[in-house]
Structure formats: C-alpha cells, structure tokens
Curated annotation (Swiss-Prot):
Residues involved in substrate binding: D7, S8, Y39, G40, N71, T72, T207, H208
Pathway(s): Cell wall biogenesis; peptidoglycan biosynthesis
Encoding gene, per UniProt annotation: murI
Active site: C70 (proton donor/acceptor), C206 (proton donor/acceptor)
Name of the protein: Glutamate racemase
A molecular-function term among this protein's GO annotations: glutamate racemase activity
C-alpha cells in the first residue's frame, strides 16, 4: 500500500515533499494531471470528473489514501467525491481507502482552531479585524471556501481572496523569475487596493505558489506571516494515520512520479525548487 498525492500539475510537489519529510518510510505515488492543468479556470463538473479519475488511478496503483494537493480540487470536488463516489469505490476495491484535501488543515492553521469548532455568533461588532489575504486560482476564489469556513470559526478575521488566473500556468511553463515577480507584485498590489492596505497575514492558496514563496515574501511587507499549506497538511496527515491504523501507508520508502502529460524531466524552475533532476513517468 502507499500514499497517493494528486495535483493538476507540479504544485503538489510542495505538499509531497513535506509529507515525505514527515513520513519518510511510507511509499508515495505522485500523480500530476498535466494534460489538463491548470484546474483553476475549469467548470466545476470538469474538476470533479478529473479529480475522480486521478483518485481512481492512484487507488488502482495501490494507494490506501489520496491527498488532494490542489486547492481547486479540494474546494470543488472533495466533499462531493467523499459523499457520492468514494463509498462505492471503496466497496468495489474491498479495502479501506479515503480521500483528504488540504483546505481543512490550512483553515485550522489560519484560525488556530480545530475543524470541528464553530464559534458562537454573538452579533456584536468586532472592532479590530485581522486581515487575511488568500492568493488562489479563480476556481478556489469563486468557491469562497476560505471566507465561509474561516468566518464560521473566527469573526475577528476578515478574509480577502485575490484570484491569480495566470500564475499556476506560468509556473508549469517554467516562466522566468522577473516575469513571475512582476505577476506576483501585480496581484499583491491589486489586493492592497481592494483592502485599502496590505493584509496582516497571507495564505498561498494554490500549492504551485509555494514554489515561488520567496517572491510573495518580497512583494508583501517584510515579516508578513505566510500560512504554509505543506507544513499544515503534513501535521494533519501524521495525526490522521495515528488515528486510522487500518490505512496502510507502506514501509518501503518508495517514490513514484506520474504524469498524464509528457513524461520526462520537469522545467528548471521546478527542478531548482526540488533540488535536482526530477523525471515523471507516463500515468
């Protein structure tokens, strides 16, 4: 058995690395749906269908758990797949399996509260708001998942999402540092204009953006805290396996990288982040 990690492209490698560092003995299969990346601008039904196909591929390859290392898939497809598709597929395989996303641990990190906690709404006006900026794909921003779920738990946090329609595609294509920095700066300034000031904290709400986290740090005021999805997801997954011993993550330390796109090495931007050559096999 193994842990499957699924993303529309290479952004999920940021989560994959954090999971491997936390669970080094586990076997991992990474699947990038690069033939259909990015997901952020696709209709919801397409995102659900593509995410389901990716999960099926990973379960058929022996995964006991699939982590959706993609905010768009987690926001739009996860709950629906858990409720309507997963029970039947679990029965067909005849073994324990599950699918988890990355938004729940991110919201727990952003609020400092467990997912199960929902604040009592008292109705009084909160004088001092913590301004949280979320940089994401258009699909994630349109879902308003961060605004809705954080507001349930913390009325003293105001969430402002900034959709970045081109950024994930640019990272997939290996755009240069100057081009990427210009795009990041543009979105940071757009968010600042809408809010009236810089955010107090920020979530990089697309796993691709972790690859260029240094550019966001440079564009935001010095010291602005970034909530890192890979770290919060690794924390959550470690606890999840402790609570669910029926799910086997494997013990061989295997690493497999698959793509629905063109097999072979990844672009220089990705390999610089990874720290060396990285070849994907055909899914």
């Amino acid at each position: 058995m193994s842990i499957g990690v699924f993303d529309s492209g290479v952004g999920g490698l940021t989560v994959h690395r954090a999971l491997v560092n936390r669970l080094p003995q586990a076997d991992f299969i990474y699947l990038a749906d690069q033939a259909n990346a990015p997901y952020g601008g696709r209709p919801g039904e397409e995102i659900v269908a593509l995410t389901r196909a990716g999960c099926e591929r990973l379960f058929d390859a022996g995964a006991s758990l699939v982590v959706l290392a993609c905010n768009t898939a987690s926001a739009i497809a996860l709950r629906r797949l858990q409720q309507t598709w997963l029970p039947g597929y679990r029965k067909a395989l005849g073994r324990p399996i599950n699918v988890l996303g990355i938004i729940v641990p991110t919201i727990e990190a952003a609020t400092g509260l467990p997912w199960e906690h929902e604040a009592e709404r008292r109705g009084e006006k909160v004088e001092q708001l913590d301004i949280l900026g979320v940089f994401s794909t258009p699909g994630t921003a349109a879902s308003r998942v961060y605004e809705i779920e954080i507001d349930k738990r913390r009325q003293d946090v105001a969430v402002f999402s900034e959709p970045c329609p081109n950024l994930a595609r640019m990272i997939e294509a290996g755009a240069g540092a100057v081009e990427l920095a210009t795009e990041v700066e543009r979105h940071v300034q757009q968010l600042k204009t809408r809010i009236g000031r810089y955010p107090d904290r920020a979530i990089l709400g697309c796993t691709h953006y972790e690859i260029i986290a240094d550019l966001f740090r440079a564009a935001l005021p010095a010291g602005t805290p970034l909530i890192h999805q890979p770290a919060s997801t690794a924390d959550a997954l470690e606890l999840y396996f402790q609570r669910h011993p029926e799910l086997d993550p494997g013990t061989g330390g295997g690493r497999v990288f698959l793509t629905t796109g063109t097999p072979g090495p990844q672009n220089a931007l990705v390999e610089t982040f990874w720290g060396g050559p990285l070849r994907f096999e055909a899914a």
